[in-house]
Design a protein with these regions (language model features):
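Short beta-strand/loop element within the Bergerat-fold HATPase_c
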Residues: 151-164
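Conserved DHp (HisKA) dimerization/phosphotransfer helix of two-component histidine kinases, i.e.
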Residues: 40-44, 57-110
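Acidic ATP/Mg2+-coordinating residue in the GHKL
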Residues: 172
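C-terminal beta-strand of the catalytic ATP-binding
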Residues: 217-222
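Glycine-rich nucleotide-binding loop
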Residues: 165, 176, 209-216
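ATP phosphate-binding glycine-rich loop and adjacent ATP-lid/helix-beta elements
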Residues: 179-207
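Conserved short strand/loop->alpha-helix "switch" segment adjacent to the catalytic nucleotide/phosphoryl-transfer site
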Residues: 13-31, 85-87, 104-135, 142-153
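Conserved phosphoacceptor histidine of two-component systems
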Residues: 24-39, 43, 47
């Protein structure tokens, strides 16, 4: 029987059969829906905030949006990773840093968020606490660490420690602030940072960075 050109091509071709994509589990589907719901909530809050004239109230709405975004990011990571209830903090902080750079930094003025984060796996609720801490500190740093119109960087660093835990550092190179005053955190944001750090069961401190200020959180083996 004569072989056609198509037959020869089909006979000689190497066909790579890709494994089917994993079916989303019930928890994946829940995380996907939660992330979508939080995105909808964020859009509603954003629409409401556009009509506010009072700068203090507007700032409170903006911070609320960032807190919602930090929580939604955890659920997006859970849905994408198919790792059950565990979140890769490195991937999560990379994404969160980009979102914070877009929302609170000013790249045109030379203000950036730099992230160097190791791929530490943590539980979802732990990642949520870390996200809220980072969002609060980065936002506050761009508000107060640098003079209006001045360039500046806020860095987020995460590394695994020898004892099976991790060390988180959020640092600016700005005007600096009294670590004792920062630790007291009389505003809602400062209180949230303290509450979340305590919830994680680690040791946290505000340090002089010379120049600037550094927040450090060390969490032991989980």
């Amino acid at each position: 029987m004569m072989m056609t050109t198509i037959d020869r091509v089909a006979q000689n071709a190497r066909v790579t059969v890709l494994p089917p994509a994993p079916e989303p589990s019930t928890s994946d589907e829940i995380n996907h829906r939660v992330a979508n719901s939080l995105q909808l909530l964020s859009a509603m809050v954003s629409a409401e905030a556009r009509g506010i004239q009072d700068p203090v109230a507007a700032a409170a709405f903006d911070m609320t949006l960032r807190r919602i975004g930090a929580i939604a990011g955890v659920h997006r990571q859970l849905y994408r990773s198919h790792q059950g209830a565990m979140v890769n903090l490195g991937t999560y902080l990379d994404e969160l840093g980009g979102e914070l750079e877009e929302s609170v930094a000013d790249t045109a003025a030379g203000r950036f968020v730099i992230v160097h984060a190791a791929g530490v796996l943590v539980r979802a609720e732990e990642a949520t606490s870390i996200g809220i801490i980072v969002s609060e500190i980065v936002t506050n740093a761009f508000k107060h660490a640098y003079a209006p119109g001045a360039s500046g960087i806020v860095s987020i660093a995460l590394r695994a420690t020898a004892r099976g835990g991790y060390l988180l550092e959020v640092k600016d190179c700005g005007q600096g602030r009294d670590p004792d005053q920062a630790a007291r955190g009389t505003g809602l944001g400062g209180r949230l940072v303290g509450m979340m750090a305590t919830k994680l069961g680690g040791h946290h401190a505000w340090l002089h960075a010379n120049p600037g200020t550094c927040f450090e959180l060390c969490v032991g083996k989980r």
